[in-house]
Regions:
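Juxta-kinase regulatory segment immediately upstream of eukaryotic protein kinase catalytic domains
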Residues: 1-20
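An alpha-helical support segment within catalytic cores of ATP-dependent transferases
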Residues: 2, 6, 136, 157-205
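Active-site acidic catalytic loop and adjacent metal/ATP-binding pocket
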Residues: 28-39, 189-236
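ATP-binding pocket architecture of kinase catalytic cores
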Residues: 40-136
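A cross-family kinase active-site recognition segment
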Residues: 111-173
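Active-site activation/catalytic loop segments of kinase-like enzymes and analogous catalytic loops
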Residues: 235-278, 293-311
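All-alpha amphipathic helical-bundle segments outside canonical DNA-binding/catalytic cores
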Residues: 281-292
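Helical subdomain adjoining the active site within ATP-dependent kinase catalytic cores
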Residues: 302-327
């Protein structure tokens, strides 16, 4: 991008010139995305006119909520007109703070995974305790069930995943089990619907992974990338972030009961980390197991594993699925 263009845009935000820039172009077809890191202080973000002033204002308020609990997050800047967005040809642009810390994915071999995981999980508990039912967004998080997230079409992602699992079971001649899985899912969702509107929720970053977690000296310090931010029911958020996984090693070496019990134990251990910072109310205590049931049977990585494991050892995988739906 031409330096004069950058200087002109930055001047609208009260930033006078720059000495260094790094351009990151992640454009995909018609989806134009250009980020320009300026002097490791600012990020100029240019994309299609899909981002709105209201959405950026909501993200900026969320950033302050994270900072309030001791988690760094990039603030947004307003231009001289008092707006976050500025026009740039056929696109729009805005400016965010640059946080000069390494990403976790860059330091994974130098950090203790369990330490970072637990620090991140504790921050989830702190955020939920501090911000529940405060300044909620109309946009739902990608974890959402019942209400749809922006990328959902007709059904939420977990229902879509479950439908894929059911289709695979039927294709293997396991029609009875497929119907049982559907009934299990429907019953859990029906119980959640009865409580749904009264469950505490808050706005979350919504896409925690090693590519947007910042670390310093082996510890979690902050988050970037709030494009997937949205409102989420706290206990659903907790279950999704503590899903863990049935590892290939466990699946290969242990029987179905051991695999399932190990998975359950790991999930509870990680959930307990969140709950060291957050106390469930009575309604959440009633709902959390049904959210966990839905996560186990229909989160994307789980369904992909089940489909693969059905190919490797159908009998063992069916036993695991039956443990899930009988629990």
């Amino acid at each position: 991008m031409d330096n004069k263009e950058i200087i002109h845009i930055l001047s609208e935000y009260g930033i006078d010139g720059f000495s260094d820039k790094t351009e990151i172009d992640s454009t995909n077809g018609d989806d134009y995305r250009l980020n320009v890191i300026i002097d490791k202080k600012y990020v100029l973000r240019i994309n299609n006119a899909v981002m709105t002033e209201e959405r950026l204002a909501s993200i900026d308020r969320l950033v302050e909520k994270y900072r309030r609990i001791g988690v760094l997050a990039p603030r947004l800047f307003k231009n001289k007109e008092g707006d976050y967005l500025s026009a740039h040809g056929d696109h729009v642009c805005y400016v965010s703070e640059y946080l000069d810390y390494p990403l976790w994915e860059e330091k994974e071999n130098e950090t203790d995974v369990e330490t970072i995981r637990k620090e991140v999980l504790r921050s989830i508990g702190r955020l939920s305790k501090k911000s529940s039912n405060e300044d909620l967004s109309d946009v739902m998080s990608m974890w959402s069930i019942i209400d749809l997230a922006p990328l959902d079409v007709d059904v939420d992602e977990k229902q879509e995943n479950l439908d894929l699992l059911v289709e695979n079971l039927k294709g293997l001649g396991e029609t009875e089990l497929a119907h049982e899985v559907e009934a299990f899912n429907d019953n859990a969702r029906e119980r959640i619907r009865a409580l749904y509107k009264d469950l505490p929720r808050c706005v979350i970053q919504g896409d925690l992974n090693a590519s947007n977690i910042l670390i310093e000296d082996g510890h979690f310090v902050g988050l970037i990338d709030f494009n997937m931010a949205g409102t989420e029911v706290n206990v659903n958020h907790f279950c999704c972030e503590t899903n863990e996984e049935i590892t290939e090693e466990d699946f290969a070496e242990k029987d179905a009961d051991e695999v399932y019990e190990n998975w359950k134990r790991e999930q509870q251990e990680m959930l307990d980390v969140i709950l060291s910072e957050y106390q469930l109310n009575d309604l959440e205590k009633k709902a959390i197991e049904d959210y966990r049931r839905i996560c186990r049977i229909s989160m994307y990585p789980n369904v992909m594993s089940f489909i693969e494991y059905l190919k490797r050892d159908k009998e063992k995988t069916i036993k695991i699925l039956r443990r899930i739906i009988s629990d």
